[in-house]
Regions:
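Catalytic-site signature of metal-activated, phosphate-bearing donor transferases
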Residues: 68-75, 82, 93-258, 263-276, ...
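Short, acidic, metal-binding catalytic loop of nucleotide-sugar glycosyltransferases
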Residues: 25-36, 301-310
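Acidic helix N-cap motif at the loop->helix transition within catalytic regions
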Residues: 20-23, 45-54, 95, 294-297, ...
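N-proximal low-complexity "stem/linker" segments adjacent to membrane-targeting elements
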Residues: 1-28, 253-302, 534
């Protein structure tokens, strides 16, 4: 810490699980600032040990009320005349250090200083230092402070004089695509929740227009086209982040998932009994689940009376999923060594004893015609020359965006147990049919895809990561241009070919989310193959 006589400078940070970043950022400031104040919000890594090894004062507040209030609380611990607000992933360069030291020789009055920040993503610089880099108000007299915003917080300037410092902060935004996407989705949700709490209603035109403007601004106006492939990746990711913000806000106002759920419960309660006395084949219902207490009962209500056994393989539920399953006579098994959806379905099937397997997820429900069609199959001896598919109708945020008369997924879900099983794929697993044809059954399988848009987007990120790692393990590669065109095609397929355009605003949101998912997984795969290259 600095001991020279001058006005005191306090560095103020808020952190959570930032140990890796603190190892880089603290050495750049520890020997010349007067104090380092760090306010933690619940870290489980060794960040405190690292911080204290550099003389930082560590405080904790887990009552999170947003970034703005957390910065206010952190600043309250500071004793300096000047405040330098930093994030753990920001590194002060030597030129910036010298600029700061010159400023704090002067008494703190009414001047707030902006600091230009160069962003890095996955270790690559994505801002061009010669292209009008934006300054952030980070060095200021202690009498100033941050606003109350949950996200996108900033210093309240009032009538302050503003100046910009020479030198740069190096901002290491994310070490991996997965980290960036998860972090920005958290920001998008917090932003949407904050606006919704203020009475703001999401407008659909902003879901369409604002992401387009975000790309133009990030890639062209901010000069990231000068930074090659990583400048493009960042601009595409930021466009997706902007879409997520406005789409999540729209969903908070217009979501119909709870209505669709209650309708599915009522449907399950009003199904007619099925005569199963003429069955010649037995049927095992096979399910994999985790924390499905909300959906499982309604699912089992539509199927329990036509099957001979119910097999449930759980992967670590902490709710009352087991009690619900066992109330329907289910045989409960557990495997928490998760190896992907395909392997988990194989393990679940291994517990079954019926002639046929019917595979369902907890958020799916059989309608009356499909119940009857399955029972009709069981009236014959087990058939091994074909598998049976069901037409699945998806409700997205409670809306059936793809009209069933236009498009429905055809999924092989009913098959001879000893002759077929699911593939090993971690995500997007499917039945190995070994060249045997499928016969589509009458009726529909209703699928309650998600409770809200954020839940859907979060799953998409996880599935993208699983898909990319699986392909990388099998020595698959791709190019960025191929990933871009695949993403565009996925939008066309969803919006036009599958009829999302008939689903109104949510049809567009689903098509855009699908495009984002495709883009993410190919960028992740490309990055895995190129991360060690300059």
């Amino acid at each position: 810490m600095n001991t020279a006589k001058r006005y005191r400078l306090s560095v103020v940070m808020i952190v959570k699980n930032e140990a890796d970043n603190l190892k880089v950022s603290l050495p750049a400031i520890a020997d010349w600032v007067d104090e380092i104040i760090i306010l933690d919000s619940g870290s489980t890594d060794d960040g405190q040990k690292i911080a204290q090894s550099h003389g930082a004062k560590w405080h904790v507040n887990t009552d999170w009320q947003g970034f703005g209030r957390q910065r206010q609380l952190a600043q309250a611990y500071a004793t300096g005349d000047w405040i330098l607000a930093l994030d753990a992933d920001e590194v002060v360069t030597p030129q910036l250090k010298n600029s700061i030291l010159k400023v704090i020789k002067n008494p703190p009055t009414d001047t707030v200083y902006g600091i230009k920040r160069l962003d890095f993503v996955f270790g690559h610089q994505i801002d061009n230092a010669l292209w009008g880099v934006k300054a952030h108000w980070r060095l200021y007299p202690k009498k100033f402070q941050y606003d109350n915003n949950l996200v996108h917080e900033s210093v309240i300037l009032n009538d302050a004089t503003t100046k910009k410092l020479s030198g740069f902060l190096h901002h290491h935004t994310a070490p991996t695509p997965l980290f960036w996407l998860n972090k920005r989705l958290d920001y998008a949700k917090a932003w949407a929740d904050d606006r919704h709490a203020q009475g703001k209603k999401g407008k659909f035109y902003k879901v369409v227009v604002n992401p387009l403007w975000a790309f133009i601004k990030q890639y062209l106006l901010d000069g990231r086209f000068l930074q090659g492939r990583y400048g493009l990746i960042y601009s595409l990711f930021f466009t997706q982040y902007t879409f997520n913000k406005y789409a999540c806000l729209y969903d908070l106002t217009h979501n119909q998932a709870e209505h669709a759920f209650l309708h599915s419960v009522a449907m399950a309660q009003n199904l007619k009994p099925i005569n199963v006395s003429q069955k010649k084949s037995t049927l095992s219902l096979v399910m994999i689940c985790k924390n499905e207490s909300k959906h499982l009962k309604a699912c089992l209500e539509t199927v329990h009376d036509i099957v001979d056994e119910i097999i449930v393989l759980d992967s670590g539920s902490t709710d009352n999923t087991r009690q619900i399953a066992e109330s329907y006579g289910a045989k409960w098994h557990v495997n928490t060594d998760w190896q992907g959806f395909g392997k988990q379905r194989q393990l679940a099937q291994a517990y079954a004893t019926g002639d046929y397997v019917l595979l369902l997820d907890a958020d799916e429900r059989l309608d009356q015609p499909l119940r009857q069609a399955i029972t009709d199959v069981l009236k014959n001896p087990v058939q091994t020359d074909k598998v049976f598919s069901v037409a699945r109708v998806n409700t997205f945020c409670g809306i059936e965006v793809q009209p069933r008369w236009w498009y429905a997924d055809k999924l092989s879900r009913l098959y001879a147990r000893q002759h077929f099983q699911y593939s090993d794929l971690k995500v997007h697993e499917s039945l190995n049919q070994y060249g045997k044809p499928s016969m589509v059954l009458d009726g529909y399988l209703k699928h309650l895809t998600n409770d809200n848009l954020h839940h859907f987007l979060l799953k998409n990120i996880r599935y993208s990561d699983d898909w990319a790692k699986d392909k990388f393990t099998h020595n698959k590669n791709t190019s960025l241009i191929a990933g871009f065109f695949r993403a565009v095609f996925s939008f066309i397929r969803e919006y036009v070919i599958r009829g999302d355009l008939l689903g109104g605003a949510y049809g567009y949101i689903l098509a855009m989310a699908s495009m984002g998912y495709t883009l993410d997984k190919y960028i992740m795969l490309w990055w895995l193959n190129n991360k060690d290259k300059p």
